[in-house]
Regions:
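C-terminal helix-to-coil terminal segments
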Residues: 292-321
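Positively charged, low-complexity intrinsically disordered leader regions
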Residues: 1-52, 56
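Phosphate/diphosphate ligand-binding glycine-rich loop within oxidoreductases
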Residues: 34-41, 47-159, 281
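Rossmann-like adenosine-cofactor binding region
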Residues: 212-289, 295
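Glycine-rich phosphate/diphosphate-binding loop of Rossmann-like nucleotide-binding domains
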Residues: 44-62, 66-67, 159-236, 241-242
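Phosphate-coordination loops involved in phosphoryl transfer and adenosine-cofactor binding
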Residues: 33-39, 166-168, 271
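Short, structured coil segments at secondary-structure junctions
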Residues: 61, 133-134, 195, 215, ...
């Protein structure tokens, strides 16, 4: 596997899940695979789980790890061609990428949506420049429109905790004080559509996700109705994706606190597990009561980020041989 940016790059999900559970039993089974190989992790944005879990995964495989925070200690980077660089940006990404690539074997990139131009975000301008100009295998540690490492960990978690063969999984929008990218909900939808689940998406009008991620999923605007009989509730906020309201791309259209996941919402489910990628705004996205309940999976879900990253890096290392 040379690139990892979406669910299709991973291939057959059943074999990927089997590999994940194999690694979960013995994280160091392939500890010599990455000997004398270097993984470069490039962060344009903040990170806790992705930063720690991906470093741990690389070391599980025997790799050396270099971490670069682009906005802390590195030269400011220009990303546009044709710009007269007479401002505060000292280096162009087109030189920086091949230089960084010369020091490593595999590159991970984390770069969020900017909400300035939908086309730039949805064509994954930054991530694709690394793919085009690095000459090295590249994986996404969250890009403008997707977070596949998170979605893979989510799928592992659902597979681990499901109580029936085809559970009902609900992705629900919930309020947040800031405008957040669609990367996590996009990827979650993309992966659930490939999994053997009954998948439902619920959100206020105007928050419709891009059809290429929604695909055949059921969209229910009545949140309580969507929750009925659910086995897993996955809560996440996202700003307007600009699908039905292009002029509102990246804007906050609602802060309806009635959509916060609370005990009343969970009461209509099938004793559902609660999931969230973290970090979470308590008592906006979800109440203390729900996130602290025995059915909350946010911690094991986060722990599975190490497993998803280990599987991905293992396959990328195997592709180098």
């Amino acid at each position: 596997m040379r690139y990892f940016t979406n669910v299709h790059d991973l291939g057959d999900l059943k074999s990927a899940l089997a590999e994940a559970f194999e690694i979960k039993k013995d994280r160091y089974k392939y500890e010599t695979l990455g000997k004398h190989k270097t993984c470069l992790l490039i962060f344009f944005n903040n990170s806790l789980r992705t930063r720690l879990s991906t470093q741990k995964a690389a070391r599980n495989l025997g790799m050396d790890v270099i971490v670069l925070d682009v906005n802390q200690g590195a030269w400011k980077l220009e990303t546009e061609r044709g710009v007269i660089m007479d401002g505060d940006k000292s280096e162009h990404l087109l030189e920086a990428i091949p230089v960084m690539a010369s020091y490593c074997d595999i590159i991970g990139v984390r770069s969020f949506a900017h909400f300035e131009n939908r086309e730039d975000d949805y064509t994954e301008k930054i991530l694709n420049q690394f793919i085009k100009y690095s000459g090295k295998p590249v994986f996404s540690m969250e890009a403008a429109t997707g977070h596949p490492l998170q979605a893979f960990a989510d799928l592992i978690t659902i597979e681990e905790y499901k109580k029936k063969d085809r559970p009902k999984v609900v992705l629900t929008w919930a309020p947040h004080p800031r405008a957040l990218p669609q990367a996590v909900p996009n990827s979650f939808a993309d992966w659930m559509n490939e999994a053997d689940v009954d998948f439902v998406i619920t959100h206020p009008e105007g928050y419709e996700l891009d059809p290429k991620f929604v695909r055949g999923a059921k969209v229910e605007y009545n949140q309580m109705k969507a929750f009925e009989g659910a086995d897993f509730i996955y809560a996440k906020n996202w700003a307007c994706p600009g699908v039905t309201r292009p002029a509102d791309y990246g804007k906050i259209l609602s802060k309806d606190m009635n959509l916060t996941v609370d005990a009343a919402h969970m009461a209509v489910t099938n004793d559902a597990f609660f999931m969230h990628c973290l970090p979470v705004r308590r008592n906006m996205i979800v109440t203390d009561e729900v996130i602290e309940a025995p059915t909350s999976l946010v911690i094991p879900e986060a722990a599975n980020r190490e497993i998803s990253a280990t599987v991905v890096l293992k396959r990328m290392l195997e592709g180098l041989e």
